[in-house]
Structures are given as structure tokens and as C-alpha cells.
Amino acid sequence: MQPVPQPQSTNDLHGLNDDSEEDESDNGVGLGDSEDERVVMKGRSKSKSKKQAGSDDEDDEEEENDYNNDEDHYLDATTEVEAKKSTSKKPLDKAKKAPKKNKTGVIYFSSLPPYLKPFALKNLLETRSFGPITRVFLSPEVRPASAPRRRSNKRKTYSDGWVEFASKKTAKICAETLNATIIGGKKGGWYHDDVWNMKYLKGFRWADLMEQVQRERSEREARKRVEDSRARKEDKVFLEGYEKGKVIEGIQKKNEEKGKKKKDSAKEVRMVFKQNEVKLGRDKSAEDPGRLGDDTKRVLGKIF
């Protein structure tokens, strides 16, 4: 038979119960504290992780900002370099595009040899080492209307001319050395004995010459238009006067004829009447002695 356990006292039970309850409560409290600590630790870890994430995000943002700032700084640097380049290029471009000073010289020829062409004049000057020559202009000779026409020779003659040299110094030396000297060259040349008549024009430009030539041309054309209009008016007046004179002459002729007729009518006019022929009747014969002529009467008188 197994021994039956004795029942414990209620106090002991209650005491045991109290101890157990206290232990349980203590254990409960301890468990609760540990759970709280765990929760707190979890919260801290979460907060730390959040803070770390936030810090990581902030670091990323800062890095991005730094990268953007670096990019902006790089762009600013490149723009500054480009601006410097552009500013450095601008004065160069301006210097390149700056208009060059007029360094050309112009010589005026007051007279030219007959039938001398522009190309021949340029060749004569360049053979004497006066060059380079940039432009040559010769004004043709204007012959008056009263001058006789040249039928045999059709070559042009020039009255004066201008020659532009690339250097003013060359133009001055050319004018000083060749003025009032013979053209020279070959002895049998066409222009050997002709004399140079030239002068260096100080401060004269080719544009001034072109303006002068255009002005003279316009004046000449205007003068020609005025002369043509005047000639047309004179022709018109002459034709009108000629036609009017013809009309007056016709009227005068008619008046003269009328006057002659009046004079002829004023003379005495003998009136002449035309007599009609008288016809004989049936009873009367043509042998009526009363109507015989003198000849018949004389013949009859001789017979009888």
C-alpha cells in the first residue's frame, strides 16, 4: 500500500501560495521588465535604424548636392572659360575686321599720247619698275559736233587719265621721276618722243575719282537731254511755222486770183446776143428773089 500524503495546513498553503504568488508576481514583474526592455531596445534599434537610414539619406542627399554643386561649378568654370575665350576672340575679330587704312596713291595724267590704250600705259609704267598698279582709268576725248568725222581711223583717243598704285611711295617716286620727260623706249616706237605730263594727287582716293566721273557723266547726260529737248522744240516750232506759212501763201494766192477777177469785171463789156435761126414756112421757097444774094443779082444782071 502506498503511503497517503498528509494534507498541509492552510497557513502553509496560504503561505506557500503567497510565496508562489510573490514569486510569480516577481517573475511576472521581471518578465514585464524584460519585455519592456526588449520593446525599448527594439524601439531604439528601430529609431537607430531610422536615424541611420535618415543619416544615410541625408548623406546621399549631401553627396548628390555636392555632385550637383561640383557639376554647377564645372559648368560655371566651362562657361567662364568659354566667356574668356569669346572675350579673347572678340578683340581679335574686331582687329581682323577693322578696315585697313588707304595706302594707295593716285597719279593724274593731264595729257596722253594719241591712241594710247590703258593696257599700254600700264605696261609702260611697269616696265620702268613702277608697280604694282591696281587700277587705270582713261577718259575718252569728246570731239565737238562741228569737227569733221574721221572715216579712215576708228581708234580711240583719250584726253586725260588716272592711275592708282598699291603704294603711295611708289606713286610719289613715279610722278617725281617721270614728269616732264620723254616716254622713250625703242627709237622707232610710236610713243618715243611724247612727253609725260603727270602729277601726284595728295589725299586723293579712287572713290573720289569715281564720284567725280559719275557726277560729270550725269551732268553730261543732263546737258544732252536739255539740248535734245531744245532741238525737238526748235524742230516743232519750225514745222509749225512752215505749215502756217504754206496756209498763208495759199490764202494770198486765192486773194490775188479774186482781185484779178474783180479787175477784169470792172472793164466795159460789149453785150453780144445770140440770134436764133429763122425757118421758112411752106409757101415760101428758098428761090425767093427778094432773098437772093448780091452775087446772084450781079450774075443775073450781066445775063439779061
UniProtKB/Swiss-Prot annotation:
Protein family: Belongs to the ESF2/ABP1 family.
Quote the gene name from the UniProt entry: esf2
Q: What is its main location?
A: nucleus
- Biased composition regions of type Basic residues, renumbered to the chain: 41-51
- What name does this protein carry? Pre-rRNA-processing protein esf2
GO CC terms of this entry:
nucleolus
Q: Which UniProt keywords apply?
A: Nucleus, Ribosome biogenesis, RNA-binding, rRNA processing
Task: Give the function comment from the record.
Answer: Involved in the small subunit (SSU) processome assembly and function, and in the 18S rRNA synthesis. Required for the early cleavages at sites A0, A1 and A2.
Q: Where, per UniProt, does this protein localize?
A: Nucleus, Nucleolus
| GO BP annotations listed | endonucleolytic cleavage in 5'-ETS of tricistronic rRNA transcript (SSU-rRNA, 5.8S rRNA, LSU-rRNA); endonucleolytic cleavage in ITS1 to separate SSU-rRNA from 5.8S rRNA and LSU-rRNA from tricistronic rRNA transcript (SSU-rRNA, 5.8S rRNA, LSU-rRNA); endonucleolytic cleavage to generate mature 5'-end of SSU-rRNA from (SSU-rRNA, 5.8S rRNA, LSU-rRNA); small-subunit processome assembly
Q: Which Gene3D superfamilies match?
A: 3.30.70.330
